[in-house]
Design a protein with these regions (language model features):
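Eukaryotic basic, amphipathic alpha-helical target segments in cytosolic regions
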Residues: 23, 27-31, 76-77, 180, ...
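Conserved G1/Walker A P-loop phosphate-binding module
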Residues: 1-154
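Alpha-helical scaffold elements adjacent to nucleotide-binding pockets in ATP/GTP-utilizing enzyme cores
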Residues: 18, 68-72, 175, 193-197, ...
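Inter-motif core of Ras-like GTPase G domains
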Residues: 134-186, 197-211
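Charged, alpha-helix-enriched surfaces in structured cytosolic catalytic cores
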Residues: 10-14, 50, 63, 67, ...
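Conserved nucleotide-binding/hydrolysis micro-motifs of P-loop NTPases
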Residues: 99-101, 150-152, 186-188, 215-218, ...
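Canonical P-loop GTPase G-domain recognition
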Residues: 200, 204, 208-209, 214-270
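Short coil/turn segments at secondary-structure boundaries
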Residues: 35, 69-74, 84, 106-109, ...
């Protein structure tokens, strides 16, 4: 009987480098031989394993996703559009970079240094609606934020999409460390498409957090009704018995309007 194999300890400088070394040396060849990417997630690239933590933002149109990102970043960013109507019609990855410009989807998915090469499988219709927004700030130095199109209320509005919205959201969710689901506190509703998206993300339920945005104009009584209504709506969609952690405030650079709840909402912002 031969002696068991012994391996010299790997000299890795970080946990990310250790994961990359172990995945490349022991897992990737097995996945490739077993055609793992044909029936589940695609093979991971070096850039994906070494990428910064990712946060995915989802919500119906005009829920304040883009303003939320601007509030966190502290400045405008490339490809930013804010307005009462559905303004964000594509996916944007806010990342650290010196160019201060928006990199189109085709170029973004061609770069080996970016963790988005696998997105090319969704076709040119999606790539035309995807970009990387490079911005230097404290936020992007620590993580990557994914802004998404507003989820629309009716099926007719979604018929014009030439790409699989649910599949793309699922791809980002699989690689995200946190998923923020934003609601406008003035118009709580769960559309059919939003229900479909939440059901798609059941496997990533532990990553999800709720944000009730634009809440500073509401009274204490109204906030209680809004919170109760939101939990009632989502209770019919989420399958887990636990209540999701929720944050309630107005995430923009304007002063809070309700002095009675200013302290509470300031703490929620932090």
């Amino acid at each position: 009987m031969g002696k068991p194999k012994t391996y010299a300890p790997a000299n890795y400088g970080s946990v990310s480098e250790a994961l990359l070394g172990l995945y490349t040396g022991k897992v990737k060849d097995v996945e490739r031989d077993m055609l793992f990417d044909r029936f589940t997630t695609s093979l991971l690239s070096d850039a994906e394993l070494l990428a910064k933590p990712m946060v995915l933002l989802l919500g119906q149109y005009s829920s304040g996703k883009t303003s939320f990102i601007r509030y966190l970043a502290g400045k405008d960013f490339p490809a930013m559009h804010v307005g009462p109507e559905p303004t964000t019609d594509g996916f944007a990855a806010l990342m650290d970079g010196t160019s201060g410009t928006a990199i189109p989807g085709n170029a973004a998915t061609s770069s080996k240094s970016r963790p988005f090469r696998a997105l090319s499988k969704f076709g040119s219709a999606f790539l035309n609606k995807f970009c990387i927004s490079e911005l230097q700030c404290e936020l992007t130095d620590q993580l990557t934020l994914i802004d998404t199109p507003g989820i629309l209320a009716g099926s007719k509005q979604t018929m014009g999409r030439q790409y699989d919205f649910s599949a793309i959201v699922k791809w980002f969710a699989e690689r995200s460390d946190m998923i923020l689901l934003l609601f406008d506190a003035h118009k709580i509703d769960v559309s059919d498409e939003l229900k479909e998206i939440i059901e798609t993300l059941h496997a990533h339920d532990e990553k999800m957090r709720l944000v009730l945005n634009k809440a500073d104009c509401l009274s204490t009584e109204e906030i209680m009704h809004v919170y109760g209504g939101t939990m009632w709506f989502l209770g019919k969609v989420f399958t887990t018995p636990e209540v999701k952690r929720s944050y309630m405030s107005s995430f923009w650079d304007k002063p809070l309007k309700n002095p009675e709840l200013e302290r509470f909402m300031t703490e929620e912002r932090q």
